[in-house]
Regions:
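Histidine-centered, transition-metal-coordinating active-site segments
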Residues: 1-63, 67-73, 80-81, 102, ...
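Short coil/turn residues that cap or connect secondary-structure elements
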Residues: 33, 78, 94-97
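Active-site alpha-helix of zinc metalloproteases
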Residues: 86-87
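Short active-site segment of divalent metal-dependent hydrolases/proteases
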Residues: 90, 94-98, 182
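A glycine- and small-aliphatic-rich helix-loop capping segment at beta-alpha/alpha-beta transitions
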Residues: 99-112
Length: 288
């Protein structure tokens, strides 16, 4: 009863004739999949910024994992799976190269040059609204656009027009929580593969609550969401939230702040700063 219905969508910025075989959310999903920005996600790394190997996550594989997790939860909760999928596939279209370190560097540089800052959720909306299709944008529905801008808990540029509001649909809530399920698990999996940590390092309380394998942990988190979600929003149980905080603390202490990660962070800062300042100078010479 709380699913967002395509027939009740608030529509698009530019009105279009309906499609005879696809709902408006299905069309949004397809437009995102066929966009250039979606294809570019395969070149953007996650935690390991310069990985050596074929099996580490990229922003594209992360997006696909979020989509799968979100669709499963949405289906179980009788929500609109098409809307959920569209939001999930579009949520990181504006993310930077080099993971969140890249976002941090660009945010600092943008503020330094009086541009207000940078947030990947706001940039994702800018991508679908203004950058795709040679500036025409994808003309997505209001619900998908809102889900994209509100998928993150971080500070969102108020110039996006959406401020810091919480997700406006349950489907958007599902994507937000699925994003956490995906990154917590694949960041740990990538760290194990890279030898940054080993299985005995994982906190015992996390193994006891979530499971010993990657598949078990994802399944435990998904089932916990399905079994504990309220009518107002999808959520975790208190005991699972405590375990998530333990895992997040472990990742920050042992993976994100690992010595090799710190070295890569300094390289990222140097590269992005040089590229940013080059573009600023080019804009001064040629405002067009």
């Amino acid at each position: 009863p709380h699913a967002a219905l395509s027939s009740q969508s608030r529509g698009r910025q530019t009105e279009e004739a309906p499609c005879s075989v696809r709902t408006c959310y299905q069309r949004d999903r397809d437009r995102i999949i066929h966009s250039k920005s979606f294809r570019r996600l395969k070149y953007k790394t996650q935690v390991l910024l310069l990985p050596e190997g074929d099996h580490y996550r990229t922003r594209l594989t992360h997006t696909l994992e979020v989509s799968q997790i979100a669709r499963t939860i949405s289906r179980a909760l009788l929500l609109n799976e098409d809307l959920t999928e569209a939001i999930a596939l579009g949520h990181d279209l504006g993310h930077t190269p080099f993971g969140h370190m890249g976002e941090k560097v660009l945010d600092s540089l943008a503020k330094e040059h009086g541009l207000g800052g940078f947030h990947h959720a706001a940039q994702s909306l800018r991508v679908v609204d203004h950058l795709e299709k040679d500036g025409k944008g994808l003309n997505l529905t209001w619900e998908v656009r809102m889900g994209i801008i509100q998928h993150s808990k971080g500070q969102v540029d108020v110039r996006s027009g959406f401020g810091l509001a919480e997700p406006s649909t349950l489907e958007a809530w599902v994507v937000r929580i699925s994003d956490s399920v995906a990154y917590l698990n694949h960041d740990l999996d990538d760290a194990l593969r890279a030898g940054i940590v080993s299985d005995p390092d994982i906190p015992e309380s996390v193994i006891k609550k979530m499971g010993a394998s990657h598949a078990q942990r994802i399944n435990s988190l998904i089932m916990d969401i399905i079994e504990n979600s309220e009518e107002s929003r999808p959520t975790f149980s208190p005991s699972m939230l405590a375990s998530i905080e333990t895992l997040r603390g472990f990742l920050y202490g042992s993976v994100y702040r690992h010595a090799n990660a710190q070295i890569e962070d300094s390289r990222v800062e140097h590269v992005l700063a040089a590229l940013f300042r080059y573009r600023v100078e080019k804009c001064k010479d040629d405002p067009q």
